[in-house]
Protein backbone atom coordinates (compact mmCIF):
# COMPACT_ATOMS: atom_id res chain seq x y z
CA UNK A 1 0.00 0.00 0.00
CA UNK A 2 2.81 2.41 0.90
CA UNK A 3 4.64 1.60 -2.33
CA UNK A 4 1.47 2.31 -4.32
CA UNK A 5 1.06 5.69 -2.57
CA UNK A 6 4.66 6.64 -3.36
CA UNK A 7 4.09 5.65 -7.00
CA UNK A 8 1.08 7.98 -7.18
CA UNK A 9 3.13 10.82 -5.72
CA UNK A 10 5.76 10.37 -8.40
CA UNK A 11 3.08 10.79 -11.06
CA UNK A 12 2.00 14.18 -9.71
CA UNK A 13 3.37 17.35 -11.35
CA UNK A 14 6.52 18.66 -9.67
CA UNK A 15 4.76 21.83 -8.53
CA UNK A 16 2.33 19.76 -6.46
CA UNK A 17 5.25 18.25 -4.55
CA UNK A 18 6.99 21.56 -3.83
CA UNK A 19 6.21 22.58 -0.27
CA UNK A 20 7.10 26.19 -1.20
CA UNK A 21 4.59 26.30 -4.06
CA UNK A 22 2.82 29.67 -4.00
CA UNK A 23 5.09 31.06 -1.28
CA UNK A 24 7.56 32.82 -3.56
CA UNK A 25 7.00 36.53 -4.13
CA UNK A 26 7.78 39.11 -6.77
CA UNK A 27 9.75 41.85 -5.03
CA UNK A 28 10.39 45.11 -6.86
CA UNK A 29 12.71 47.92 -5.75
CA UNK A 30 12.08 51.16 -7.63
CA UNK A 31 14.55 54.03 -7.64
CA UNK A 32 15.51 57.04 -9.73
CA UNK A 33 19.14 56.34 -10.65
CA UNK A 34 21.59 53.47 -10.99
CA UNK A 35 23.30 53.23 -7.57
CA UNK A 36 20.25 54.40 -5.55
CA UNK A 37 19.78 50.85 -4.29
CA UNK A 38 23.21 51.12 -2.62
CA UNK A 39 22.92 54.55 -1.00
CA UNK A 40 19.47 53.67 0.37
CA UNK A 41 21.05 50.56 1.93
CA UNK A 42 18.48 48.29 0.28
CA UNK A 43 20.80 46.17 -1.87
CA UNK A 44 21.67 43.61 0.83
CA UNK A 45 17.94 43.09 1.41
CA UNK A 46 17.49 42.39 -2.31
CA UNK A 47 20.35 39.89 -2.17
CA UNK A 48 18.76 38.12 0.79
CA UNK A 49 15.39 37.58 -0.85
CA UNK A 50 16.90 36.53 -4.15
CA UNK A 51 19.00 34.00 -2.23
CA UNK A 52 15.79 32.69 -0.66
CA UNK A 53 14.30 32.06 -4.08
CA UNK A 54 12.04 35.06 -4.60
CA UNK A 55 11.88 36.92 -7.93
CA UNK A 56 13.61 40.25 -7.28
CA UNK A 57 13.64 43.17 -9.71
CA UNK A 58 15.36 46.56 -9.67
CA UNK A 59 13.55 49.29 -11.62
CA UNK A 60 15.54 52.42 -12.50
CA UNK A 61 13.62 55.44 -13.75
CA UNK A 62 16.34 57.59 -15.31
CA UNK A 63 19.39 56.99 -17.46
CA UNK A 64 21.60 58.84 -14.99
CA UNK A 65 23.28 60.58 -17.89
CA UNK A 66 24.01 63.80 -15.97
CA UNK A 67 25.88 62.19 -13.07
CA UNK A 68 29.39 63.09 -14.23
CA UNK A 69 32.47 62.76 -12.01
CA UNK A 70 36.03 63.86 -12.74
CA UNK A 71 37.59 60.56 -11.73
CA UNK A 72 35.51 58.63 -14.31
CA UNK A 73 36.22 60.88 -17.26
CA UNK A 74 32.94 59.99 -18.96
CA UNK A 75 31.04 62.91 -20.54
CA UNK A 76 27.38 63.57 -19.84
CA UNK A 77 24.86 62.19 -22.29
CA UNK A 78 24.63 58.89 -24.11
CA UNK A 79 28.16 57.80 -23.20
CA UNK A 80 27.47 58.04 -19.49
CA UNK A 81 23.97 56.58 -19.87
CA UNK A 82 25.48 53.49 -21.52
CA UNK A 83 28.11 53.15 -18.81
CA UNK A 84 25.51 53.41 -16.05
CA UNK A 85 23.25 50.85 -17.74
CA UNK A 86 26.16 48.41 -17.71
CA UNK A 87 26.86 49.28 -14.08
CA UNK A 88 23.24 48.51 -13.19
CA UNK A 89 23.48 45.14 -14.94
CA UNK A 90 26.70 44.38 -13.07
CA UNK A 91 25.10 45.27 -9.73
CA UNK A 92 22.01 43.14 -10.34
CA UNK A 93 24.13 40.18 -11.43
CA UNK A 94 26.30 40.53 -8.33
CA UNK A 95 23.27 40.68 -6.04
CA UNK A 96 21.80 37.61 -7.75
CA UNK A 97 18.61 39.39 -8.81
CA UNK A 98 16.93 39.75 -12.21
CA UNK A 99 18.41 42.07 -14.88
CA UNK A 100 17.53 45.73 -14.30
CA UNK A 101 14.36 47.25 -15.73
CA UNK A 102 15.50 50.56 -17.23
CA UNK A 103 12.73 53.07 -17.91
CA UNK A 104 15.09 55.36 -19.84
CA UNK A 105 13.77 58.73 -18.66
CA UNK A 106 15.94 61.83 -18.57
CA UNK A 107 18.12 62.43 -15.53
CA UNK A 108 16.80 65.37 -13.54
CA UNK A 109 13.59 65.44 -15.58
CA UNK A 110 11.09 63.53 -13.48
CA UNK A 111 9.55 66.51 -11.69
CA UNK A 112 9.50 68.76 -14.75
CA UNK A 113 6.31 67.34 -16.21
CA UNK A 114 3.32 69.21 -14.80
CA UNK A 115 1.42 65.96 -14.13
CA UNK A 116 4.40 63.56 -13.86
CA UNK A 117 2.73 61.68 -16.69
CA UNK A 118 5.86 60.14 -18.34
CA UNK A 119 6.99 58.25 -15.24
CA UNK A 120 3.40 57.55 -14.21
CA UNK A 121 2.66 55.78 -17.49
CA UNK A 122 5.91 53.80 -17.47
CA UNK A 123 5.55 52.59 -13.90
CA UNK A 124 1.89 51.74 -14.40
CA UNK A 125 2.93 49.57 -17.34
CA UNK A 126 5.66 47.87 -15.27
CA UNK A 127 3.24 47.11 -12.43
CA UNK A 128 0.67 45.62 -14.80
CA UNK A 129 3.28 43.45 -16.50
CA UNK A 130 5.15 42.12 -13.45
CA UNK A 131 2.43 42.35 -10.76
CA UNK A 132 4.79 42.73 -7.79
CA UNK A 133 3.74 41.46 -4.37
CA UNK A 134 6.16 43.75 -2.55
CA UNK A 135 7.37 47.21 -3.63
CA UNK A 136 10.25 49.13 -2.08
CA UNK A 137 11.06 52.73 -3.00
CA UNK A 138 12.27 56.09 -1.74
CA UNK A 139 10.51 57.62 1.23
CA UNK A 140 8.97 61.10 1.02
CA UNK A 141 12.33 62.52 2.13
CA UNK A 142 14.01 61.43 -1.09
CA UNK A 143 17.10 60.59 0.94
CA UNK A 144 18.70 63.99 0.74
CA UNK A 145 15.79 65.70 -1.00
CA UNK A 146 16.68 64.98 -4.65
CA UNK A 147 13.60 65.83 -6.72
CA UNK A 148 13.98 62.76 -8.94
CA UNK A 149 13.94 60.63 -5.79
CA UNK A 150 10.88 62.41 -4.43
CA UNK A 151 9.08 62.13 -7.76
CA UNK A 152 9.66 58.37 -7.83
CA UNK A 153 8.25 58.20 -4.31
CA UNK A 154 5.12 60.19 -5.14
CA UNK A 155 4.45 58.34 -8.40
CA UNK A 156 4.81 54.89 -6.86
CA UNK A 157 2.61 55.98 -3.96
CA UNK A 158 -0.02 57.47 -6.30
CA UNK A 159 -0.29 54.22 -8.21
CA UNK A 160 -0.32 52.10 -5.07
CA UNK A 161 -2.91 54.07 -3.13
CA UNK A 162 -5.32 53.93 -6.08
CA UNK A 163 -6.10 50.41 -4.90
CA UNK A 164 -5.86 49.00 -8.42
CA UNK A 165 -2.92 46.70 -7.70
CA UNK A 166 -3.33 43.26 -6.24
CA UNK A 167 -5.13 43.34 -2.91
CA UNK A 168 -2.17 41.70 -1.19
CA UNK A 169 0.50 44.01 -2.67
CA UNK A 170 2.56 45.79 0.00
CA UNK A 171 4.51 49.05 -0.25
CA UNK A 172 7.54 50.01 1.82
CA UNK A 173 9.78 53.08 1.95
CA UNK A 174 13.51 52.93 2.63
CA UNK A 175 14.68 54.95 5.63
CA UNK A 176 17.78 55.70 7.70
CA UNK A 177 17.02 55.78 11.44
CA UNK A 178 17.63 59.19 13.04
CA UNK A 179 19.61 57.62 15.88
CA UNK A 180 22.09 55.96 13.52
CA UNK A 181 22.30 59.01 11.26
CA UNK A 182 22.98 61.22 14.29
CA UNK A 183 25.88 58.98 15.31
CA UNK A 184 27.21 59.20 11.78
CA UNK A 185 27.22 63.00 11.72
CA UNK A 186 28.28 63.64 15.33
CA UNK A 187 31.21 61.24 15.03
CA UNK A 188 32.09 62.80 11.65
CA UNK A 189 32.31 59.41 9.99
CA UNK A 190 31.45 60.81 6.59
CA UNK A 191 32.98 63.17 4.09
CA UNK A 192 30.39 62.83 1.31
CA UNK A 193 27.87 65.63 1.64
CA UNK A 194 24.83 63.52 0.72
CA UNK A 195 25.11 61.42 3.89
CA UNK A 196 25.64 64.42 6.11
CA UNK A 197 22.62 66.09 4.45
CA UNK A 198 20.46 62.95 4.64
CA UNK A 199 16.89 63.30 5.89
CA UNK A 200 16.59 60.63 8.60
CA UNK A 201 13.44 58.94 9.90
CA UNK A 202 12.45 58.30 13.52
CA UNK A 203 12.67 54.60 14.35
CA UNK A 204 9.07 54.51 15.56
CA UNK A 205 8.02 54.85 11.91
CA UNK A 206 10.54 52.28 10.64
CA UNK A 207 8.61 49.29 11.92
CA UNK A 208 9.91 46.80 9.34
CA UNK A 209 13.41 45.67 10.29
CA UNK A 210 14.95 43.00 8.10
CA UNK A 211 18.04 41.11 9.19
CA UNK A 212 20.52 40.26 6.45
CA UNK A 213 23.49 37.92 6.54
CA UNK A 214 27.15 38.83 6.32
CA UNK A 215 27.17 37.26 2.86
CA UNK A 216 24.27 39.49 1.78
CA UNK A 217 26.16 42.56 2.98
CA UNK A 218 29.32 41.42 1.18
CA UNK A 219 27.34 41.00 -2.03
CA UNK A 220 25.87 44.47 -1.58
CA UNK A 221 29.31 46.04 -1.13
CA UNK A 222 30.70 44.15 -4.12
CA UNK A 223 27.71 45.36 -6.16
CA UNK A 224 28.42 48.92 -5.02
CA UNK A 225 31.80 48.71 -6.75
CA UNK A 226 30.00 48.09 -10.04
CA UNK A 227 29.05 51.80 -9.91
CA UNK A 228 32.62 52.94 -10.53
CA UNK A 229 31.57 56.02 -12.53
CA UNK A 230 29.86 57.52 -9.47
CA UNK A 231 32.32 56.94 -6.64
CA UNK A 232 36.08 57.42 -6.47
CA UNK A 233 37.94 55.03 -4.15
CA UNK A 234 37.54 57.04 -0.94
CA UNK A 235 33.81 57.53 -1.57
CA UNK A 236 33.37 53.82 -2.26
CA UNK A 237 34.92 53.15 1.15
CA UNK A 238 32.68 55.69 2.84
CA UNK A 239 29.54 54.36 1.17
CA UNK A 240 30.54 50.85 2.27
CA UNK A 241 30.71 52.13 5.87
CA UNK A 242 27.32 53.80 5.40
CA UNK A 243 25.87 50.50 4.22
CA UNK A 244 27.30 48.73 7.29
CA UNK A 245 26.18 51.40 9.76
CA UNK A 246 22.84 49.72 10.54
CA UNK A 247 24.52 46.52 11.79
CA UNK A 248 23.00 44.07 9.29
CA UNK A 249 19.48 45.45 9.75
CA UNK A 250 17.62 47.13 6.89
CA UNK A 251 14.93 49.56 8.03
CA UNK A 252 11.72 50.16 6.09
CA UNK A 253 8.63 52.25 6.67
CA UNK A 254 5.37 50.60 5.60
CA UNK A 255 2.60 52.40 3.77
CA UNK A 256 -0.27 52.01 6.21
CA UNK A 257 -3.85 53.13 5.86
CA UNK A 258 -5.82 53.59 9.08
CA UNK A 259 -6.96 50.18 10.39
CA UNK A 260 -10.55 51.39 10.74
CA UNK A 261 -12.82 54.19 9.57
CA UNK A 262 -12.98 57.14 11.96
CA UNK A 263 -15.34 60.11 11.98
CA UNK A 264 -13.47 62.31 14.47
CA UNK A 265 -9.96 63.77 14.52
CA UNK A 266 -9.63 64.09 18.29
CA UNK A 267 -11.09 60.81 19.50
Predicted regions and their residues:
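Metal-dependent de-N-acetylase/amidase catalytic core
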Residues: 5, 15-27, 117-267
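Active-site rim/loop-helix segments in enzyme catalytic domains that contact anionic ligands
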Residues: 14-130, 157-165
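Sec-dependent N-terminal signal peptides
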Residues: 3-11
Amino acid sequence: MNLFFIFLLLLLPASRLDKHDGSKKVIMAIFAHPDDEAVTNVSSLLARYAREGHKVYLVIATKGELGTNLHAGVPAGDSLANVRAREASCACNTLGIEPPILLGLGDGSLSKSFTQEPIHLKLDSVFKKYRPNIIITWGPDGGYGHMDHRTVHTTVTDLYQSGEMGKDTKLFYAGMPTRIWRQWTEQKKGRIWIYNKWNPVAEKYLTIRIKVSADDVNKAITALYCHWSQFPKEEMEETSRWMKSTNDTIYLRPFLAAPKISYDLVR
